[in-house]
Amino acid sequence: MEALWACWVTLRQWGLTNSPNPLFKNPKTRIQLKPEVQWELDQAETITTDRLAHAFETRTRWYQTINNAFGQYDFLALPSAQVFPFDVAQHWPTEIEERQMTTYHHWMEVVIGGTLSGCPVISLPAGFDDQHRPMGIQFIAPIGEDKKLLEFALAYEEALPWQDAYAQIGK
């Protein structure tokens, strides 16, 4: 997972450096961006061609790995988050199960597999914890199987009584 994480961070930051967004390029507006975005932009400036090439190689290997999995499975399923919703005053979780989150977005690591695969992904409700906080499950389908994934999602939602659960949120 660490290789995928490094790949995703590199490609994300590289994408920011190629953004036409004038807020990123203008020092007067860049300073007004939140510190996490400024950090991303600063990190992006350190990306070497070797690091970028390695990220693309990692993504290619991941694409091949996930594509091979679809030889055995119609869909892949993962949690849609590593933590339940947290207090709005908290910027982000800094630790999950005694594992330090190294960046402001590391707590979302579980979604990068689907993102990097290029496959269609959908997140659906999975249930609630004892504090009525929702959790989801992400389903990943093979490339080109968007319709199949949407049909599955519809059947999933029709088969489970989520409407009743949603009505209980906040009670």
Q: What name fits each language-model region?
A:
Residues H54, F86-W107:
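Short, surface-exposed loop/helix-turn segments at secondary-structure junctions
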Residues E2-W14, F86-P93:
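Short glycine/threonine-rich loop-to-helix capping motif typified by GTGT followed
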Residues T10-N67, P79, V83-F84, S123-A126, ...:
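Short helix-loop capping/hinge segments that flank enzyme active sites or metal/cofactor-binding pockets
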Residues A53, Q64, Q72, T115-K171:
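Structural helix-boundary/capping segments
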Residues G15-Q32, H105-M108, E145-E158:
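Short, basic, helix/turn surface patches
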